[in-house]
């Protein structure tokens, strides 16, 4: 008979951070942890088909199994291409 595990689910915005602790059955998935956290109801901007997720900063799939003490993170979409931003900074530095 599987036991219980405690997992944190985190979602951070520039102005506010959400951190929900949930208790799940052993063998629960990342998606189950997110749904149990209630963040999908609190934040309608979270779309699990678009937002990437991770466990302690390591990319994860919604189907990955979570373990006791894990922190599941929901990442916001990038608003700018990092390569493009680096290119622009390099051009700006070269023009000085």
UniProtKB/Swiss-Prot annotation:
Family matches, as Gene3D superfamilies: RnfH-like
Cleavable signal peptide: none
UniProt xrefs under InterPro entries: Mopterin_synth/thiamin_S_b (IPR016155), RnfH (IPR005346), RnfH_sf (IPR037021)
Domain of life: Bacteria
Family named by the database record: Belongs to the UPF0125 (RnfH) family.
Entry-linked PANTHER family: UPF0125 PROTEIN RATB
Name of the protein this chain belongs to: Protein RnfH
Species assigned in the record: Escherichia coli O81 (strain ED1a)
